[in-house]
């Protein structure tokens, strides 16, 4: 008797090639439902609709299609249990040898702007997870495939093993099935529960060599069923990504996402920017960012918001870099970068989309906060000094404020010509970060501006900045001693702007 395959998929990638091989090479019969059955029929493949096989029509507008004993009996029957076989025969149920199923696109639906609760609920799959769990449970007797990436491997299994998939492959596929349903249910629960419950489930993509340090095991996980963010990036060349590479790449992505209208480049070391700049071209932006702190740039992570061209590639290979990421890479640029084969070059078309939440583990649980993705708006800023900023100063203040948001607190950025020229990060007191940033800027601090991620608790930071030649400052405001800082700025002829938004980063 021919073997039986049940197919019901939302993602039809690779479906026709798979089923054609099943029919022509391995003598499978096909049963399918809804749009999947129509796709197979349109491709000229012989297929029996689930409704015809079960004798029960689809009802409730398609909500009930595969929830039937002839389906689940065929999936769950144990071939080595005589009573199970007797039950199949008495109920005219064929054993199902292969289940190919993936689920309604719930996550894609809720990601759309303006989606309603009722629209989201209609994308909660019922029959799909039931088939996926049932077939995963019974992996000893059948195979389940829930990802088009599995299709070629499955066919090769059949070709190498006289038309049978190995137990090892079936068990591995069952695990993938359970992970798929767990991730799917997690997305639904998180959506419906809002802040009351937060579940984090990931599928391991890669075992990493180690974590932050060699004695710390680490792995990389994908959340959700669809690759997004770094899981959707393409690595063009270079060694495997490390834990620290990925952490720094995300820090670089967050900064570069602040700038869309103008070519921008940032260089990251230990999650802090050692150089960030805007330019008339991406090559100019990178050179300005590199020259901002060429010593720290050695071994850095570079993010660019424009495609890598040949001119930029020639600059990139002049120093040792761990990683470079950009939306794309031109062919001649890739050839140039190939001269430094160890540098990891990645492309990620959408560098602006990041996680909506930030999660941190603590003893006994974890903390969740919404990501700091507030967009800087100069129309909401308050100029609190007698001197008003020039248009050029205001643009520079905005640039520095966007970068300062991504510097570890206490964070200070000194900038000029849309380039960071001094960065003070992670100091326990704010004036300490101010002094570090100004020392790094040196003579370039004259006529530059300074941004602070938190308010100035005393006027010492204002006076220290003025002594170095700073002409304008931007900070959140909100200190009990704001008037002391404002008074000092007025005495010294400085501009000071309050944003009303704090950007602590720990």
Report the location of each language-model feature:
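ATP-dependent carboxylate/acyl-activation modules
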Residues: 2-7, 98, 104, 184-506
């Amino acid at each position: 008797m021919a073997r039986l395959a049940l197919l019901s998929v939302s993602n039809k990638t690779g479906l026709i090639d798979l089923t054609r091989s099943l029919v022509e090479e391995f003598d499978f019969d096909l049963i399918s439902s809804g749009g999947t059955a129509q796709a197979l029929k349109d491709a000229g493949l012989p297929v029996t609709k689930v409704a015809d096989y079960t004798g029960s029509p689809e009802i409730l507008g398609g909500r009930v299609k595969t929830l039937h004993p002839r389906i689940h009996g065929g999936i769950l029957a144990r071939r080595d249990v005589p009573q199970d076989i007797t039950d199949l025969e008495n109920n005219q149920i064929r054993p199902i040898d292969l289940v190919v199923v993936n689920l309604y696109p719930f996550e894609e639906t809720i990601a759309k702007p303006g989606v309603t609760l009722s629209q989201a609920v209609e994308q909660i799959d019922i029959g799909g997870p039931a088939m996926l769990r049932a077939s995963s449970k019974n992996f000893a007797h059948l195979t389940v495939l829930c990802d088009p990436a599995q299709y070629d491997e499955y066919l090769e299994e059949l070709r190498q093993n006289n038309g049978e998939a190995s137990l090892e492959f079936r068990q591995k596929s069952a695990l993938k099935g359970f992970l798929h349903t767990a991730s799917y249910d997690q997305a639904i629960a998180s959506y419906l529960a809002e802040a009351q419950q937060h579940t984090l489930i990931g599928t391991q993509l890669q075992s990493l060599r180690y974590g932050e340090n060699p004695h710390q095991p680490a792995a990389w996980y994908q959340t959700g069923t669809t690759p997004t963010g770094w899981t959707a990036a393409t690595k063009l060349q270079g060694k495997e990504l490390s834990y620290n590479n990925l952490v720094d790449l995300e820090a670089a992505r967050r900064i570069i996402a602040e700038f869309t209208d103008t070519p921008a480049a940032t260089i990251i070391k230990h999650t802090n920017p050692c150089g960030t700049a805007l330019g008339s071209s991406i090559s100019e932006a990178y050179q300005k960012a590199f020259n901002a702190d060429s010593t720290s740039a050695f071994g850095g992570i570079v993010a660019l918001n424009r495609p890598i061209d040949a001119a930029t590639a020639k600059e990139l290979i002049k120093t040792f870099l761990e990683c470079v990421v950009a939306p794309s890479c031109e062919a001649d640029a890739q050839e140039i970068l190939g001269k430094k084969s160890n540098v990891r070059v990645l492309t990620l078309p959408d560098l602006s989309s990041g996680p909506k939440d930030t999660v941190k583990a603590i003893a006994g649980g974890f903390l969740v906060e919404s990501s700091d993705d507030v967009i800087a708006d100069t129309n909401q800023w308050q100029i609190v000094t007698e001197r008003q900023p020039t248009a050029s100063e205001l643009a520079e203040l905005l640039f520095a404020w966007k970068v300062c948001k991504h510097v570890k607190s206490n964070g200070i950025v000194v900038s000029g010509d849309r380039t960071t020229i001094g960065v003070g990060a992670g100091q326990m007191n704010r004036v300490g970060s101010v002094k570090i940033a100004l020392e790094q800027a040196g003579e370039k601090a004259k006529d530059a501006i300074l941004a602070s991620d938190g308010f100035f608790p005393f006027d010492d930071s204002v006076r220290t900045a003025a002594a170095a030649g700073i002409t304008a400052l931007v900070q959140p405001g909100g200190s009990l001693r704001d008037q002391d800082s404002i008074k000092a700025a007025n005495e010294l002829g400085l501009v000071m702007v309050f944003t009303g938004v704090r950007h602590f980063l720990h």
